Amino acid sequence: MAQKIKAGNAERLLLPGRVSHQIASAGAGADNICVRLVEIEPEHQQLFKRNRHYHPDVEECIYVLEGEGCTYADTGEYSMSVGDTLIMPPHEHHVTRNTGRSILKLLCFFP
């Protein structure tokens, strides 16, 4: 059965260095996907700097909705702006930082 999740009902995750809302996940009725809306403040406004991380068993798809950023990964540095997509393979350490002057807004997908 199809399910609609209103913007205000997305679960807010307590993740360091960013505001993250889990729009779709197993907890919201999805079987095989997780979708997050992530907002990262400009570097000079951040109280906490995020560390690199990785996903052991899944790819991550990062789509830029607003702003400018750079993802620092094992395989290189990837500058990103509105409309860009980055596919991060399993086990690759990475972190995305805001390199612009306004909020960096990302839509992140995991299988």
Feature roles, as predicted:
Residues 75-90:
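Short acidic-glycine-tyrosine-enriched beta hairpin
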Residues 70, 90-111:
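Ligand-binding loop in jelly-roll beta-barrel domains
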Residues 36-56, 90:
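Conserved short histidine dyad/triad with adjacent acidic residue
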Residues 37, 66, 73-75, 98, ...:
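Residue-level recognition of conserved beta-strand positions in structured domain cores
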